[in-house]
């Protein structure tokens, strides 16, 4: 996750005297952030769902006791942040029991929901948990969102969920996955954020996992991505200068950090040196390092986009043992300070900022986890290379390919 607001507020800390919350809860934490898909069942079948969720039971999911025992082990390991996800987490009958347990242990707890099941009947229970943050997905205006989510009326139900959270005093965020189908609706989504007094805007670039991989042909061309990021940076900077507390973050494309640096050179050049130092300290992609995933069956993955690569299972080995085991070739590479990147990513002058970006896009398109990330939208001039072979094209999904960590 790339916290745009955090970096821009740090450049103008005196403006408005309203800095956004810093990136703690990570401060001083030993274990990774755990995004936990507690249930795979969902009342929607979204086109870009990495979990390929559906409205049916998935056998073998962890029991209440098994989840709590794993939470205990995670806390001992040093993890302090849990993002409870699905499927739709509100479809798990014990979601509030598990959430209360996590809060009582001292975890920062976020809830990742599609928002359609947040109602007058359960908003009190949601408030009683004391979630630190509730993220609700909105992928466009009404018709576009309902098409993405494959359910008529999903947009109105999600907006209701946002309003109920806001009325209950719960910090709520809007999550938006950017594709060719909804790119022109980004201005309207940013306006929606203001109208509904949403606290946080999360823009996710399309990553190639689950249905997102099967629909990867809808990913943006690079110039489209650049236009979207220009708008997001400009909107965030306007909020910073006005002293507004809204947060803007992105995910699944760590080239955003480098592009912000180039945006700053054009728009706020006096801050470029300080910004570059902060971005290098950030270091980019955290898969296998500070971000992890446990799926509904207890399988551990380097992050949520690696469901076809399992490191181990919490019912068979402690999470801490799985996470620290670098005998696995993928984890060995991800944990290295200088990842074994190849091609364009290896030659990039900014790899110390982006960390090699998303490895899953390279994995799904080429079968090689260390190949160039086709989602990088920076030009050859910007990354400091010349006379490279043609970029890896984003081809339509045509079935599984042979993969290897080399």
Task: Annotate each predicted stretch with a short phrase.
Residues 43-51, 343-360:
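Local cysteine-cluster metal-coordination motifs and their immediate loop/turn environment
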Residues 285-288:
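Short, small/polar residue-rich loop motifs at catalytic or cofactor-binding pockets
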């Amino acid at each position: 996750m790339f916290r745009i607001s955090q970096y821009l507020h740090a450049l103008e800390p005196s403006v408005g005297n309203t800095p956004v919350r810093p990136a703690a809860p990570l401060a001083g934490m030993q274990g990774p952030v755990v995004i936990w898909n507690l249930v795979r069942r969902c009342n929607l079948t979204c086109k870009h769902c990495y979990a390929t969720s559906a409205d049916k039971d998935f056998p073998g999911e962890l029991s209440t006791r098994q989840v709590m025992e794993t939470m205990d082990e995670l806390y001992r390991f040093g993890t302090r942040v849990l993002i409870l996800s699905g499927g739709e987490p509100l479809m798990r009958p014990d979601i509030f029991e598990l959430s209360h347990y996590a809060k009582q242990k001292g975890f920062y707890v976020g809830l990742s929901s599609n928002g359609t099941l947040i109602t007058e009947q359960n908003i009190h229970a949601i408030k009683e948990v004391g979630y630190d943050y509730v993220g609700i997905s909105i992928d466009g205006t009404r018709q576009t969102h309902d098409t993405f989510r494959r359910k008529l009326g999903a947009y109105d139900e999600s907006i209701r969920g946002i309003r109920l959270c806001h009325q209950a005093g719960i910090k709520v965020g809007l999550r938006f996955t950017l594709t060719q189908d909804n790119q022109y609706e980004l201005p309207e989504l940013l306006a929606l954020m203001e109208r509904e007094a949403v606290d946080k805007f999360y823009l996710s670039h399309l990553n190639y996992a689950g249905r997102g991989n099967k629909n990867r042909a809808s990913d943006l061309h690079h110039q489209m991505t650049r236009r979207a990021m220009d708008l997001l940076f400009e909107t965030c900077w306007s909020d910073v200068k006005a002293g507004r507390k809204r947060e803007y973050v992105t995910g699944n494309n760590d080239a955003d950090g480098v592009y912000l640096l180039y945006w700053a050179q054009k728009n706020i050049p006096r801050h470029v040196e300080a910004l570059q130092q902060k971005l290098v300290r950030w270091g980019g992609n955290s898969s296998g390092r500070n971000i992890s995933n446990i799926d509904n069956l207890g399988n551990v993955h380097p992050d949520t986009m690696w469901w076809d690569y399992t490191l181990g299972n919490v019912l068979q080995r402690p999470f801490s043992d799985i996470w620290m085991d670098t005998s696995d070739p993928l984890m060995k590479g991800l944990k290295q300070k200088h990842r074994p990147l190849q091609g364009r990513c290896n030659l990039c002058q900014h790899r110390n900022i982006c960390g090699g970006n998303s490895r899953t896009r390279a994995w799904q398109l080429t079968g090689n986890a260390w190949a160039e990330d086709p989602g990088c939208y920076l030009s050859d001039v910007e990354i400091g290379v010349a006379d490279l072979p043609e970029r890896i094209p984003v081809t339509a999904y045509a079935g599984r390919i042979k993969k290897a960590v080399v």
